[in-house]
Amino acid sequence: MQLNSNEISDLIRQRIATFNVTSQARNEGTIVSVSDGIISINGLADVMQGEMIELPGNRYALALNLERHSVGAVVMGPYSDLAEGLKVKGTGRILEVPVGRGLLGRVVNTLGQPIDGKGAIENDGYSPVEIIAPGVIERQSVDQPIQTGYKAVDAMVPIGRGQRELIIGDRQTGKTAMAIDAIINQKDSGIKCVYVAIGQKASTIANVVRKLEEHDALKNTIVVVATASDAAALQYLAPYSGCTMGEYFRDRGEDALIVYDDLSKQAVAYRQISLLLKRPPGREAFPGDVFYLHSRLLERASRVNVSYVERFTKGKVKGKTGSLTALPIIETQAGDVSAFVPTNVISITDGQIFLQTHLFNSGLRPAVDPGISVSRVGGAAQTKIVKKLSGGIRTALAQYRELAAFAQFSSDLDDATRKQLDHGEKVTELMKQKQYAPMSVAEQALAIFSAEKGYLGDVPLASIGDFESALMAYAKSEHSALLDTINKTGQYDDDIEQSLHKLLKTFTATQSW
């Protein structure tokens, strides 16, 4: 087949006429160095602090150092195949994660991608991981309780909705167990939960997820995971991602609870990134802004007022306040709470629960030290019946600790001192509680009432646990209406007091424990 010159020229004219030119402006740069997950990029202009930079292979890096001639970025993922000379692109976007109800019951990574093998997640959109905390005018005071299900916590260190309560202690003192029990206790309360696991073993996280599933608490919980094998950047960003997912519920007039397990490992990951970016180290080799790292995160946990929720939802939700309660966890070394990160977080939060190794090893679990554990705002939110009854518990324990120290040096004690010691021992025993066995407000009130009104006097110390178990079983079977009333109202009046006295007198007369 031969083409003549006219056909060739017509074909060329046709191609020229249909040729479409599209121009695309791209902010492109070149990798000039790669080391330990940190890349240095030349040629990128107009880059924001915290901007996502697109790398080859559908990966991203986070711009953290903006210098005159280069950009220092931390790779969010594997970096072994990155090399000098590769082209990268600025996206013009800050890091965002998916939010919405579709995340409940799922296990996701720092970027909100599912890692539980249950398929794609239906989200309600994306939100930036770094959001400025609500202002002073947008907040409301904390006056509603959040029940952890632990007698020792709800009676002595009460937590309110929108509070930040630090759980601090050495390794293996029950910090995670306390936080997981608090999540399990919310399964029927309507409070949505977020559990952020930072720098933990994958097997430990799998066990936590399994326990949440066993106790039917996973359905209202989002689990955000950055394991010990994940990049330092992902461990550093995980708490912010989880906080954004929790804020979705707060801003729509609902209540949410978030657990950061733990912020010590996040600080270590941030220190690693900062040192690799050649930022000047300070105390304990942490960078100068490690306080701001945690303060900007924990300030986002708050209770917001009605006008904030109405403005955010554009009038769709009316007359509701929202809250995000934070339970950050800090691991101490040999009980040293005066280290850099623990003191920072103690000063940021609204109280702390100290878990002591010697109490844990002596069999007191949860190992809460009532002497130095405080809640700075939770008292206003405490359920009335528990608040009224628990005042004497803290005093009894404080006096017991003081007298027990003196009793070691003296065998000759008067009757009043001996009675105080016996009462303190029994109250300490009563505060013990098994894991995965949270108690309702009514059950806690009944247990505290029995101690406060002297019903433990004739019960041997070794039988306190059996006494409590039998008392709860008896109350549930014979006085369920009374327990329901206390759980619904939380009030304490003469009628409730008389009913509790009657219940305990009848029960103690049976001696059935």
From Swiss-Prot:
Name of the top EC class for this enzyme: translocase
Molecular-function GO terms, alphabetical: ADP binding; ATP binding; proton-transporting ATP synthase activity, rotational mechanism
GO cellular component, one term: plasma membrane
Catalytic reaction list: ATP + H2O + 4 H(+)(in) = ADP + phosphate + 5 H(+)(out)
Protein's membrane topology: Peripheral membrane protein
InterPro entries, sorted: ATP_synth_asu-like_sf, ATP_synth_asu_C, ATP_synth_asu_C_sf, ATP_synth_F1_a_nt-bd_dom, ATP_synth_F1_asu, ATPase_a/bsu_AS, ATPase_F1/V1/A1_a/bsu_N, ATPase_F1/V1/A1_a/bsu_N_sf
EC annotation from Swiss-Prot or TrEMBL: 7.1.2.2
Site residues by UniProt (Required for activity): 373
Main function: Produces ATP from ADP in the presence of a proton gradient across the membrane. The alpha chain is a regulatory subunit.
Record flagged with keyword Cell membrane: yes
Keywords: ATP synthesis, ATP-binding, Cell inner membrane, Cell membrane, CF(1), Hydrogen ion transport, Ion transport, Membrane, Nucleotide-binding, Translocase, Transport
UniProt-recorded name of the protein: ATP synthase subunit alpha 2
Membrane as UniProt keyword: yes
Lineage start: Bacteria, Pseudomonadati, Pseudomonadota, Gammaproteobacteria, Vibrionales
Residues at which ATP binds: 169-176
Summary of subunit composition and partner proteins: F-type ATPases have 2 components, CF(1) - the catalytic core - and CF(0) - the membrane proton channel. CF(1) has five subunits: alpha(3), beta(3), gamma(1), delta(1), epsilon(1). CF(0) has three main subunits: a(1), b(2) and c(9-12). The alpha and beta chains form an alternating ring which encloses part of the gamma chain. CF(1) is attached to CF(0) by a central stalk formed by the gamma and epsilon chains, while a peripheral stalk is formed by the delta and b chains.
Similarity remark: Belongs to the ATPase alpha/beta chains family.
Location(s) in or outside the cell: Cell inner membrane
